[in-house]
Amino acid sequence: MMNFLRRRLSDSSFIANLPNGYMTDLQRPEPQQPPPAPGPGAATASAATSAASPGPERRPPPAQAPAPQPAPQPAPTPSVGSSFFSSLSQAVKQTAASAGLVDAPAPSAASRKAKVLLVVDEPHTDWAKCFRGKKILGDYDIKVEQAEFSELNLVAHADGTYAVDMQVLRNGTKVVRSFRPDFVLIRQHAFGMAENEDFRHLVIGMQYAGLPSINSLESIYNFCDKPWVFAQMVAIFKTLGGEKFPLIEQTYYPNHREMLTLPTFPVVVKIGHAHSGMGKVKVENHYDFQDIASVVALTQTYATAEPFIDAKYDIRVQKIGNNYKAYMRTSISGNWKTNTGSAMLEQIAMSDRYKLWVDACSEMFGGLDICAVKAVHGKDGKDYIFEVMDCSMPLIGEHQVEDRQLITDLVISKMNQLLSRTPALSPQRPLTTQQPQSGTLKEPDSSKTPPQRPPPQGGPGQPQGMQPPGKVLPPRRLPSGPSLPSSSSSSSSSSSSSSAPQRPGGPTTTHGDASSSSNSLAEAQAPQAAPAQKPQPHPQLNKSQSLTNAFSFSESSFFRSSANEDEAKAETIRSLRKSFASLFSD
């Protein structure tokens, strides 16, 4: 076969009949191999060869009949065989990778050494600057993906795989990306009763995917209803008492039909779940209270009522990790809502009383890493706690840069704690592809007989048990006929021929006969458990087998091979390289 290819590719008529530009490497003359210097013996041999060869088969000298000049190629391939097999190998690799038969290519060092942090916040705060240059787990960078809830979407599977889609506008350009975050920092409210402010489905999806976050996704979902949070504060009030935890009185109405009991006026009615002073109305008398009840009927939600406190100032006690700050806000415009109009904000000393408030509230819902307690200080000299905020609380005061740095350090600390115990899963590798491999690999190892290839084409029928362990030969041509009885006939022929090479060895070959016959008997039973030992029907160099050996298929693919076949693959590749080198060097 090799001689036929050498003669065929060396034929000048075969090259001349090719279209212009096709296999240009064969049509282009080789300037690096000039004809030998003319001598008396060489001239005589050349003349004899020219006289003996027919006209169409005569190879003209390059100087007298130059080869047709093909179109200039930017980067010609070194040989036809290498270009053919490289293109075929690339096509097979791409097809196998797209079908999931081989492992996905290993990510680059930059992608392996980075953890993705998803920050859900408004764009006025650039969290990428806060995490720039920070590392976790020793040498992993932090890649920040920042977006609002309205710009996110996700899909999560029960096996732990998930993907987050992000559509953001950057400088007027719509950017669409899909990624897999390793950690989530939520700085935005997940639910509001205004239009298009309900993002609880995204929180559910993150919990479904098992994403770690600050605060916990369970607590974020629980904070989507303020009466639910207030119920937790009622439990703290009952535990600590009114002196240590002065909680304001509040009445809960699940719907408008229950708003019949008249409270002590004036009261503040809060409708549904809202933020930044929305849905809060000051009611002076029972007539206004009835009007508010009719408004609650249209909203089809719950409402709460609490006594109006004539306050001197508001108090906010915040906790970020182990850092505590207390602020006092005084209204200048005289509005009963201190967040409306003009107000003066200043930081006050952190007392043990304030610290007890925020520490007690930080233990609800399994623990809050970031939280704040809001209270009012009345003109009667008493404090009244009325609300708790979670990680979506806005940063206030002159120390916002410091607070952002505290949040950054807290996120890094949590990522070091949680991600170190979480193995990184490849998003494109199936989780169950490596399990069925264990059973098929134990049989060849137990019998100490690695899968062998058939003897070469035209060679002697050497039994598989007698092949040298370090040398594997290409397959031979199989006789045409039905394929079903081939396994039994091959096993019987191998067992009958196993004793033939042992005859010239004298009486010392008795043990070798027994071992070879036992090995051949074991191999006769092996084809049902090891289908890789079936002979290949293709005779020409067994190209499919050589291509299979050229690819590094792992245990997750359908090519089941043992560790002993690595030497066989290397030997086959070396033999193919030598064959093609001798073929195209002529």
UniProtKB/Swiss-Prot annotation:
Residues 61-77 have a biased composition (Pro residues). The modification Phosphoserine is found at S10, S426. Keywords: Phosphoprotein, Synapse. Can form oligomers with SYN1. Interacts with CAPON. This is Synapsin-2. InterPro entries: ATP_grasp_subdomain_1, PreATP-grasp_dom_sf, Synapsin, Synapsin_ATP-bd_dom, Synapsin_CS, Synapsin_P_site, Synapsin_pre-ATP-grasp_dom. Residues 421-440, 508-522 have a biased composition (Polar residues). Disulfide bonds: none annotated. It comes from Mus musculus (Mouse). SUPFAM superfamilies: Glutathione synthetase ATP-binding domain-like, PreATP-grasp domain. Expressed exclusively in neuronal cells. Isoform IIb is enriched in sympathetic cervical ganglion. The keyword Phosphoprotein applies. Residues 459-537 are annotated as: H.
